[in-house]
């Protein structure tokens, strides 16, 4: 084992240890969580595997040891933007670094090879495709490579959302070297199965593993199902013209229309998608990075490897195709540690768009037909998980962390679900109407139709297709005419989530499941959590005046809150705010129905905490009778 006082021998100085390098070269006084463990592993000659959230400091785990090890560190990355930005930052810090990728001209590449052979670089970034180039192989065999860092390591797994067959060649490349170097794998988004794949395929040897967790506590998550996405977007951006943010759209056409909308309303917005020329993309990206433009409207082609720390919000105008993609894109907010918002605008049309893009996508030409079909199948599975996120009423942060296999508190206190006020509503009648409509449409046509057409039928729309198919004549036509489009689709989504409906993927047609019979024929009750968006008639403040007796009960309720919070390992305010406890002390509810009328008590919190607080109130009343 090498000791951790291995000296720094690069051109930056002599004899520096890691703490001194961290401060003097990179400007940090201390390591972030997990960094030192991985760095020590590399310096001791062990393979390492780091799973850290976006903005968690992965690059330090290979940049710093590169300066302390003899020879060269090779960083394999698919991100051209990241290569350029990190090499630029390293050079500014005085670290000799270079990148080798397709953006270099022939003469530039030859000059880089000469400098490499002359020992003028400590860190070299390469794209995985470069490993197969004959010219590169001839240069590499003459080098002393002490460390290979594989960035975005999830790309090696077919279970990963960004599978790249070129990553599978990395092991062959390592095996071809005269001496096997230390190997490190780094990623921000990897489920348990992807982590296992990475370790197995890269043939990591008893690696030092560090999973710092996927949680980004400074990010606020919310899903909104608006009537008008444009109006909602403008409302969200009101008063934020000086803040930097990214708005992701699913298609180039939508990027253009949203960017135009924002510019028309006085926002300094620019755009980014694959349909623009490389020169325009580069200019627009620089305008955003250097704050000449504050809002970037883009497809998912934007952002990989972009290291802009002051992004205050990421809004998804459309639903992404996977949790991995969403968390990676949303994670570009708040990289400076400041509070930031991650908002997703969702409607049923997003599901259709995502399925179309998956079923018709051919953006990875490295794959053969069999690989593409397998990836398509996995992408559809990931899409189902993403749809679940958009429809859940449980903690959004918890949903994401569950997906990545990380334990978490029941409530985070910093997402739309935890801060929302939900009430359970009986929708049995509406459910029977919807399920009956699905059946009657099939009886009339001999086939099933999609959610949009069902919604039009139920709301009594004079839609041309409804009339052409004669669906304005069936008995369920117009029975939900008093409901908004959003309400109707929310109920359709809920019935699917509860297992009464299923959507066939190929044509997005909606079918009844066997469970639907329980509601249609046996009167099973169906309830649905609905967010109460109105303001309470009489807002209760924390400073509300309490009688002496009420103040005593208030103190008892605070003690119970603290006890529950400690058990759940969450902040006390996440259980209930002081304002809610004050209202509770004044109203002294005796039943669950009364408890739900306390300001700040929603259906979910009532289910979790109601019994304990009701017992506390009753005990207090008994003792003071």
Cite the ranges covered by each PLM segment.
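Accessory DNA-binding and partner-docking regions appended to nucleic-acid-acting proteins
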Residues: 2-21, 352-353, 364-368, 378-380, ...
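Helicase motor core with emphasis on the C-terminal RecA-like subdomain
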Residues: 6, 12-25, 29-33, 37-59, ...
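Short helix-to-turn junction characteristic of helix-turn-helix DNA-binding domains
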Residues: 42, 237, 288, 390, ...
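Short, charged low-complexity linear segments at domain edges
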Residues: 374-404
